[in-house]
Amino acid sequence: MKVAVVGVQGDVEEHVLATKRALKRLGIDGEVVATRRRGVVSRSDAVILPGGESTTISKLIFSDGIADEILQLAEEGKPVMGTCAGLILLSKYGDEQVEKTNTKLLGLLDAKVKRNAFGRQRESFQVPLDVKYVGKFDAVFIRAPAITEVGKDVEVLATFENLIVAARQKNVLGLAFHPELTDDTRIHEFFLKLGETS
């Protein structure tokens, strides 16, 4: 199994390491590569869009053709995961900040997102969440977005303060938090198996 981590910004190396550990725990022989170029995602079995700044990441993936490769992978039923800014990019609708910056979204998750949903005063925090299919998970939030609305085909996996912070639509997984910043690989393991269950 080959997993691509789109290495434009964010916790790229942490995602690479967490995914390698998850593959090992699942007993799957695999390779995890960080990429900033077209051609790698299209030859992969799964892809991760890490956090960072959503406007910058959007410009780069759409101008370099990586966005088309992510869309194709999702269409093929392969696992796609976005964390923090990656969640924003996976979503169909953004808030006024997303619209004001003309950030192009992939539209793979029928959801509306709000940037910096928990306010600037809570830029970084960690809370235990009850994540469906995973169980209790210590989630790290950093200037996190949240999902405010979902379509009928989206399954809510976790909420915090009445906002959705994890959701799934078939093989696409969106998280407001950073699972790669913990030693717990269960969310990466769940992600890697999404192609089997979608």
Curated annotation (Swiss-Prot):
Q: In which pathway does it act?
A: Cofactor biosynthesis; pyridoxal 5'-phosphate biosynthesis
A GO molecular function assigned to this protein is: pyridoxal 5'-phosphate synthase (glutamine hydrolysing) activity
Q: Where does L-glutamine bind?
A: G52, E53, S54, R115, I142, R143
Of the GO CC terms on this record, one is: cytosol
Entry EC no(s): 4.3.3.6, 3.5.1.2
Active-site residues annotated for this sequence: C84, H178, E180
Question: Which UniProt keywords are listed?
Answer: Glutamine amidotransferase, Hydrolase, Lyase, Pyridoxal phosphate
PROSITE patterns named among the record's database cross-references: PDXT_SNO_1, PDXT_SNO_2
For this entry, list what GO says about its biological process. glutamine catabolic process; pyridoxal phosphate biosynthetic process; pyridoxine metabolic process
Q: Which reaction does it catalyse?
A: aldehydo-D-ribose 5-phosphate + D-glyceraldehyde 3-phosphate + L-glutamine = pyridoxal 5'-phosphate + L-glutamate + phosphate + 3 H2O + H(+); L-glutamine + H2O = L-glutamate + NH4(+)
The protein's role, per its UniProt record: Catalyzes the hydrolysis of glutamine to glutamate and ammonia as part of the biosynthesis of pyridoxal 5'-phosphate. The resulting ammonia molecule is channeled to the active site of PdxS.
Which NCBIfam families has this protein been placed in?
A: PLP_synth_Pdx2
Q: How does it assemble?
A: In the presence of PdxS, forms a dodecamer of heterodimers. Only shows activity in the heterodimer.
Q: Which family does it belong to?
A: Belongs to the glutaminase PdxT/SNO family.
Q: What is this protein called?
A: Pyridoxal 5'-phosphate synthase subunit PdxT
Q: From what organism does this protein derive?
A: Archaeoglobus fulgidus (strain ATCC 49558 / DSM 4304 / JCM 9628 / NBRC 100126 / VC-16)
Q: What is the lineage of its organism?
A: Archaea, Methanobacteriati, Methanobacteriota, Archaeoglobi, Archaeoglobales
Name of encoding gene: pdxT
